[in-house]
Swiss-Prot record:
<feature type="binding site">
    <location>
        <position position="275"/>
    </location>
    <ligand>
        <name>FAD</name>
    </ligand>
</feature>
<keyword id="KW-0521">NADP</keyword>
<keyword id="KW-0274">FAD</keyword>
<protein>
    <recommendedName>
        <fullName>4-hydroxyacetophenone monooxygenase</fullName>
        <ecNumber>1.14.13.84</ecNumber>
    </recommendedName>
</protein>
<feature type="binding site">
    <location>
        <position position="239"/>
    </location>
    <ligand>
        <name>FAD</name>
    </ligand>
</feature>
<keyword id="KW-0560">Oxidoreductase</keyword>
<feature type="binding site">
    <location>
        <begin position="191"/>
        <end position="192"/>
    </location>
    <ligand>
        <name>FAD</name>
    </ligand>
</feature>
<dbReference type="GO" id="GO:0050661">
    <property type="term" value="F:NADP binding"/>
</dbReference>
<dbReference type="Pfam" id="PF00743">
    <property type="entry name" value="FMO-like"/>
</dbReference>
<feature type="site" description="Transition state stabilizer">
    <location>
        <position position="440"/>
    </location>
</feature>
<feature type="binding site">
    <location>
        <position position="171"/>
    </location>
    <ligand>
        <name>FAD</name>
    </ligand>
</feature>
<dbReference type="GO" id="GO:0033767">
    <property type="term" value="F:4-hydroxyacetophenone monooxygenase activity"/>
</dbReference>
<feature type="binding site">
    <location>
        <position position="152"/>
    </location>
    <ligand>
        <name>FAD</name>
    </ligand>
</feature>
<comment type="function">
    <text>Catalyzes a Baeyer-Villiger oxidation reaction, i.e. the insertion of an oxygen atom into a carbon-carbon bond adjacent to a carbonyl, which converts ketones to esters. Can oxidize a wide range of acetophenone derivatives. Highest activity occurs with compounds bearing an electron-donating substituent at the para position of the aromatic ring, e.g. 4-hydroxyacetophenone and 4-aminoacetophenone, leading to the formation of 4-hydroxyphenyl acetate and 4-aminophenyl acetate, respectively. Is also able to oxidize sulfides.</text>
</comment>
<dbReference type="InterPro" id="IPR036188">
    <property type="entry name" value="FAD/NAD-bd_sf"/>
</dbReference>
<feature type="binding site">
    <location>
        <position position="180"/>
    </location>
    <ligand>
        <name>FAD</name>
    </ligand>
</feature>
<comment type="similarity">
    <text>Belongs to the FAD-binding monooxygenase family.</text>
</comment>
Amino acid sequence: MSAFNTTLPSLDYDDDTLREHLQGADIPTLLLTVAHLTGDLQILKPNWKPSIAMGVARSGMDLETEAQVREFCLQRLIDFRDSGQPAPGRPTSDQLHILGTWLMGPVIEPYLPLIAEEAVTAEEDLRAPRWHKDHVASGRDFKVVIIGAGESGMIAALRFKQAGVPFVIYEKGNDVGGTWRENTYPGCRVDINSFWYSFSFARGIWDDCFAPAPQVFAYMQAVAREHGLYEHIRFNTEVSDAHWDESTQRWQLLYRDSEGQTQVDSNVVVFAVGQLNRPMIPAIPGIETFKGPMFHSAQWDHDVDWSGKRVGVIGTGASATQFIPQLAQTAAELKVFARTTNWLLPTPDLHEKISDSCKWLLAHVPHYSLWYRVAMAMPQSVGFLEDVMVDVGYPPTELAVSARNDRLRQDISAWMEPQFADRPDLREVLIPDSPVGGKRIVRDNGTWISTLKRDNVSMIRQPIEVITPKGICCVDGTEHEFDLIVYGTGFHASKFLMPINVTGRDGVALHDVWKGDDARAYLGMTVPQFPNMFCMYGPNTGLVVYSTVIQFSEMTASYIVDAVRLLLEGGHQSMEVKTPVFESYNQRVDEGNALRAWGFSKVNSWYKNSKGRVTQNFPFTAVEFWQRTHSVEPTDYQLG
């Protein structure tokens, strides 16, 4: 990522240049762009309608028809250029309806108000607060503390800055970026297309379809610089305690930095500490006896050279499927220990670069970047939630939870099966015995299975009994000797806000309320007995089959900033979610999760806590979360 698209370009290029670069255009994006620029929505012919498969819009045309469409669009762009017309603004609601239903059909209609916030020009930010502290409570002393400067902390900070609310961020690391600063393992990259895994107000120019971690980290740094966030951040500062002081109606926070411990107070505290940042290393007997290097993928030791070494990897989650192919290229021997396996989501462009022509179109054709993002946002916002819904009359099993789920299973299996043609033994190992969506689906372009087919790679499904000084011993008595062991075993995802000690009214400890790993919150944000406390990316806000964490973070930040508006505008000191509201919401979430593949299946996954309750996932649609978080309902809260 080298810059931002921040201005609307002019189409000041000759015919040959346009023709050359249109050869690299995405057909659905090109048609949407030309229809918007010219105002002629009739060009969106039914026979040019794209196909939607697994959350992606593709042209679905043969090469001859694609060539005809490119030539047609070229002539329309030439006419637009020669007419001297200025580019229109963002699409109207009527235009968005026509363009959206052409792309997606009627399924998109409920989502259009949400999509409208994504369908903006590069200069616009429709989610910015429409109020300012100077206008609602100019003389009031008021401060917000945000804990964490990852993507969610950054968007919360920007919204408070836009609203004129004083704030400070305490970040335990030495820079912004959160997980993208911390995770440096080989092969680390996003599993959402780069243009969709980005803020709605900061349209980046990316080098890869699915950006490697260094690009995402650079993007986060660029956003922080562009919006003046660095000056509000205290780095290398770790908050250890947060206590609600009833007498002052403020939070008392204790943090440690290079100068020791300091106590500060704030009216509101926002926890933006993430979920996937505390590595989980299983308690395997003998773990301390291994004589070689041993580390978790999130704490990669770059001083260790695995070339020519015998390497053992425990776990096959999303991170492991990224770093294992890197290790396999030069390791002498690589053995992968896996309890369960993942369904793979076919993603041909997973490791592809953005073409020069695509970059040119994004930079030089008005609104092409808008529609390039929206053509992803529409199918991704809908996702395939319906494909993982349990149909109790089907009936659901560990193979499939509905007819739609079974079709998805068959589609993915049809993509995987040919890769096993020369290794039928791997089929028995790699085809999951759980429904699609039962655990996290992993993107792949064929690399994963081809890696496991290498002569120097093998997968071990025998349970591990003990780690020895020489390696790993399984329950069948086989000892596998290694020079290096890497854990790809995920994180303590269910232990929200750990290890920070948080106490609310009457000294109630939050982690006691949550019983360690059974976190619950209203809208994933707020909890009774903990006034003026909000979480970003909190309990049951995880997304696994649609949308992105960044889109949900933007929604969450909008809600939290609106809550602060309510406090300031009404002259209130505190707001605390009512217990019946909290309980009703969480009951519905639990019931919803029970009727999703991840709640029905018995397969082990990080979506669930130690008791089997789903603490991670939001089981409903993206548009429902948007509707619930668009503004605060005052009657949900006890205001004091």
